[in-house]
C-alpha cells in the first residue's frame, strides 16, 4: 500500500503507483450513449486521461473546461478523455451546459474500478 500526504495528513492509496513508461491497464467505461469504451477504441492515438470524482464539483468543472480549451491547439492524433463517476446522462448534460466539445467524457459509474 502506498501513502501520500494530503493537507498534512497521511492518505493510503489502493494499488500500486504507476511507473513512468509502464503500460496502463486496460479499462471498460461507459460512453454517453452507454456503449463500452476501452484502450482499443483509441488505438493509434495519443490518449490523455483526466480522472475526476464528479464534473459537478467546482475544481473538476474548472479542470475539464481548461482541458477543453487546451485541446483546441492539439493535433487530431490526440484524444482527451475525462473519467468520472457521474452517470453518462449527467456527463452529457454537463458537457452541453459547459460548452465542452473537445473532451470526451466516460463514466465509471458501474463499478468504480477505474481509479483502483
Segments (PLM) and residue ranges:
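Chalcogenol-based redox active-site neighborhoods
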Residues: 1-116
Amino acid at each position: 500500500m502506498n501513502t501520500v500526504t494530503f493537507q498534512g495528513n497521511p492518505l493510503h492509496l489502493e494499488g500500486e503507483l504507476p511507473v513512468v513508461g509502464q503500460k496502463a491497464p486496460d479499462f471498460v467505461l461507459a460512453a454517453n450513449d452507454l456503449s463500452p469504451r476501452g484502450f482499443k477504441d483509441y488505438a493509434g492515438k495519443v490518449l490523455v486521461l483526466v480522472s475526476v470524482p464528479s464534473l459537478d464539483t467546482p475544481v473538476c468543472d474548472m479542470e475539464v473546461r481548461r482541458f477543453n480549451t487546451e485541446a483546441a491547439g492539439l493535433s487530431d492524433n490526440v484524444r482527451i478523455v475525462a473519467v468520472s463517476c457521474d452517470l453518462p446522462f449527467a456527463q452529457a448534460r454537463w458537457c452541453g451546459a459547459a460548452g465542452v466539445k473537445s473532451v470526451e467524457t466516460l463514466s465509471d459509474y458501474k463499478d468504480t474500478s477505474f481509479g483502483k
